A protein has these predicted regions:
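Acidic donor-binding segment of Leloir-type glycosyltransferases
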Residues: 1-16
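Catalytic donor-sugar/metal-binding loop of nucleotide-sugar-dependent glycosyltransferases
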Residues: 104-105, 127-129, 138-156
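Acceptor/aglycone-binding surface of glycosyltransferases and processive sugar-polymer synthases
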Residues: 18-34, 39, 51-131, 157-175
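Residue-level signature of catalytic and energy-coupling elements of molecular machines
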Residues: 31, 46, 117, 141, ...
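Terminal low-complexity segments of carbohydrate-biosynthetic enzymes
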Residues: 2, 52, 176-184
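A generic structural signal for alpha->beta connector loops
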Residues: 10-13, 65, 103, 145
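Cofactor-binding loops of NAD(P)H-dependent oxidoreductases
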Residues: 18-20, 45, 151-153
Length: 184
């Protein structure tokens, strides 16, 4: 309902609702067909990321003339769940692999807060589905531009009990996608 109200009150907001949730990758594919504007920002509905940080990404894109801005997470809570260690190990490993293969210095390749210029966004063709799509668009973004910016963003992680869907096999698929997109 909140999004419908925004769409009604602001003509530059376009909302698309699906009958069945098929994940963020599917939503991004739909967005590629309908989105317009100068900048594209991906925001998860679960609000693990603070929407106030959108301004930080946008400021870097505009002032520093960056085509792609990716966040790197700062935890909003001091509560650490046991699986965070393994998640951070996986994210750090994926980030290291991406940086080695693509010659970048990204701090957190799994951060879901990303901003693209429209020109860059329309030239990215995600080659995967589900969670792999996220890594595919990052790989293609860094292949297509060297104008990359980064900024810290606040992050409040959910647990599996809270509805977190990311499991260990996502890391394996991401690893595969980073390699496949590099050599294709």
């Amino acid at each position: 309902q909140i999004i419908k109200n925004y769409e009604k009150n602001f003509n530059f907001i376009k909302a698309h609702f699906k009958e069945k949730n098929k994940g963020k990758g599917d939503s991004q594919k739909i967005a590629k067909k309908i989105v317009t504007g100068d900048y594209i920002i991906i925001q998860d509905a679960d609000l693990e990321y603070d929407p106030e940080d959108i301004n930080k990404l946008l400021k870097i894109a505009i002032e520093d003339k960056k085509n792609f801005v990716i966040g790197h997470r700062i935890m909003k809570t001091t509560i650490r769940h046991p699986y965070f260690f393994f998640r951070e190990l996986a994210v750090n490993s994926l980030t290291f692999l991406l940086n080695i293969l693509y010659g970048t210095s990204i701090k957190d390749c799994a951060c879901c807060y990303r901003l693209f210029t429209y020109e860059l966004w329309k030239n990215i063709d995600g080659k995967a589905d589900e969670f792999e799509y996220d890594f595919s668009i990052i790989c293609q973004a860094v292949k297509n531009t060297k104008q990359i910016g980064q900024c810290s963003v606040y992050y409040k992680s959910r647990t599996y009990k809270d509805g977190k869907k990311c499991t260990w096999d996502v890391g394996l698929h991401a690893f595969k996608r980073i390699i496949l997109d590099r050599f294709n």
